[in-house]
Structure formats: structure tokens, C-alpha cells
Amino acid sequence: MTDLPDTDFTQRFIFDENDARGELVSLERSYAEVLAKHPYPEPVAQLLGELMAAASLLVGTMKFDGLLILQARSEGPVPMLMIECSSEREIRGLARYEADQIAPDATLSDLMANGVLAITVDPTEGQRYQGIVDLDGETLSDCFTNYFVMSQQVGTKFWLNADGKRARGLLLQQLPADRIKDDDERTDSWRKLTALAGTLTAEELLGLDNETILHRLYHEEAVRLFEEQSLRFNCSCSRERSANALVSLGLEDAQNLVVEHGGNIEIDCQFCNERYLFDAADVAQLFAGAGIDSPSDTRH
């Protein structure tokens, strides 16, 4: 059996004569998995894809074991977007939306009025870190670029696009002074690299392979492209986690829920639509300390 070609990956590159690095991301299968879980309107599907691309690029800039969480909230018809991407490069996402309030040509400001974006790093060991930025740019690309302008000294720019089938992203980031020591020359070099990237159209970013994109933008620069690093969709929900949520309620409340819901408590994962059912016997077993070894009923 022939392996399917990898459609979900990031790929780093570096400029040999400039103090800058970059990364490209392409998502197809994982993007399709996320969109298959809910009937997202096209503008929402595009935002989700762009946020998935951003999360994938951000994980590549961080050295940590744990989880990166991007959560956008607003007062608009898309009150919430959320993407989780682990250091193992597993990604999932979801959105909440009011379909009847979303026009086909809706912009970011239309969809997420008065929005804020929280970027959370939740390491396996150590303290959680969170940064917040207003969603006041014309695009998500602008918002992520603004976040780095406000929160870090290093220059960083994003270009993000998605069309419901493919999500792509490009990141450029300045490196510490090494090849170019003069401040003015460094500034000019960075401006040139970002200006060239700014000529890339959405159609080109979505439709061209990485080698072609880099040649199109930087054929006069010395660029080294590294190996691809795969990503995949994976949901971390489980029956055990759902059971732990029930235990946190306490025995009496859990038993009452069983009665109120006709003999079964149903816990749905909002990310993947997996459903976990617990009956009175399951609840009794949980609080007896035996855990849940086999589901009484689990279904998609």
C-alpha cells in the first residue's frame, strides 16, 4: 500500500546573508477534520483555517513541551474561536457562531466585533503564560503581527490564508544581530524581506508549493529550506476525562444528573463531537473508586 503524500506540515527556512528566519505551513487533512465536525459558514471556516495556520507557526517558534491555546472572543456573530496545538504537533479547533447573522463576504471586524485574542502557553512543567491582544487589525495576520510588536522585541510578521480546503501561512522573524551588525542596515534588510513577502497574493500562498513561493519571493537571496515537520488532527478527549469531570461534581450532583436526564448522562466533546454516556451503574462505579474500564455506551 502506498503512503498518502503529507499534506499537513510546517517547513522552516533561513536567510544565509540576513539575520532572519521563516516558516511556512500547509494544512489540508487536519483542516478538513476540523471543518467536518460542524457545518461552518464559509467566513467562519476561513477564520478557523487561518487560526490553525497561526497556531502551527507559533508552535514552531517555541521551545516547550505542552499545549499552545489560541482563543478569540468577541461580541459579534462569532463569539468564540479556539485552536489547540501541542508540542507533539497535534491540532484541533472549533468555533461558536450565529449562522443567520453571517454574510458571505463578512470581514474579521464584522464577525468578531470588539474581539480579543488570548495566546496561552500551557507547559507540561512550569507556569502557564498568557498574552492578550485586541482583534483590531483588518485580518488575523495583522492581529498576530501586532501582538508581537507589543509583546516582544523581535520583529515578526504573519501572512495567513484559508479557503475551506487548504490553510496556509507564512511567518518571518528577525534573528539577533550576527551577519549584519549595523542597525540601519538591519532595519533596511528586514524591511526588504517583509516587503517582498507582502507581494505574495492569497492565491499564490494557497496554490504554490513552498519551493516555488520562496523562489518567487527571494530568488535574489540565499535561502536554505529545511525538512518538513508533520502535523495531524487529534482530539485529546476521552471517556476517562469525561468521568473525571463527573467526579468533580460530587456523588449527589452526579446521581441527580442521571435521574434528570432519564437514566444517562451524555457528555459531548465540542471539538470532535464524540459522545460519552454514563448511567447510574457507571456513576456508582466511579465514586466507589473503581474507575471506568469499559463504556456502557460510546458513540459518534
UniProtKB/Swiss-Prot annotation:
Domain of life: Bacteria
SUPFAM superfamilies, per database record: Hsp33 domain, HSP33 redox switch-like
Record's comment on post-translational modification: Under oxidizing conditions two disulfide bonds are formed involving the reactive cysteines. Under reducing conditions zinc is bound to the reactive cysteines and the protein is inactive.
Compartment(s) where it occurs, according to its Swiss-Prot or TrEMBL record: Cytoplasm
A Gene Ontology BP annotation from the UniProt entry: protein refolding
GO cellular component, one term: cytoplasm
Disulfide partners: 235-237, 269-272
Protein family per UniProt: Belongs to the HSP33 family.
NCBIfam families per UniProt: PRK00114.1 (NF001033)
Protein's name in the database: 33 kDa chaperonin
Gene that this sequence comes from: hslO
